[in-house]
């Protein structure tokens, strides 16, 4: 019996996707260039032609999605005065899990005078998907950051909703070596019922977050001026030198439109893939 269990476990592990990307960028003569790059497994990053002084990177998951037991690790370092924008080639899909949760670990380090925009396309969680994600962000006090994430609970365009599963999202932000923001979102079990609660999303199928560093009340007021155009619910606040906008909407397209309206008030440049 033990041998059969061990064999089954080994087969499951062997069939799980693994992927890792690690690279750094640096600025020279006002132009951002890529340094050392490491890629392994089914995760890749491609760099389109540079636009101005900044560098853009596009992540590609050749596994075609995320399933239970998969693991992906991303580690990025942006040196002083560099400018980097990161996105994904398509929406990421997390499929039904029959075993342990998929694990996604993202580590970002941004130096003095540098800027990093993390703007992937949405993550779509299928019913009974299991995903555990972690962001560890280390900013110099003089660095700037725009981090945007959209999560959709089910393929809403197909009339599907995520009813059961697991989604755990850890965010840790350090600035100047000090922890200034820590949050863990945990949804598991009967996710459909939890999302229906007024204190959660009031039935909305898509949620989003935009973390803006630096950010202050003046930025919050500029964003609030656009509130009449929002298709969903948007909340914005600022503290500890950064601002955070939270979104919920009935589908990804409405939420993305609201997020783009907010980002327009920050002066952020959107990745071309967001405009397709």
PLM region spans:
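Short, surface-exposed charged micro-motifs
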Residues: 75, 107, 136, 170, ...
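Internal active-site segments that recognize and position negatively charged phosphoryl groups
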Residues: 133
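Structural motif
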Residues: 83-85, 115-117, 144-146, 208-209, ...
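N-terminal, charged/glycine-rich beta-strand/loop interface patches
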Residues: 2-122, 127
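A short, polar/proline- and glycine-enriched secondary-structure boundary/capping micro-motif
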Residues: 43-47, 95-100, 128-130, 156-160, ...
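N-terminal intrinsically disordered, cationic/polar leader segments
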Residues: 2, 11-20, 24-40, 103, ...
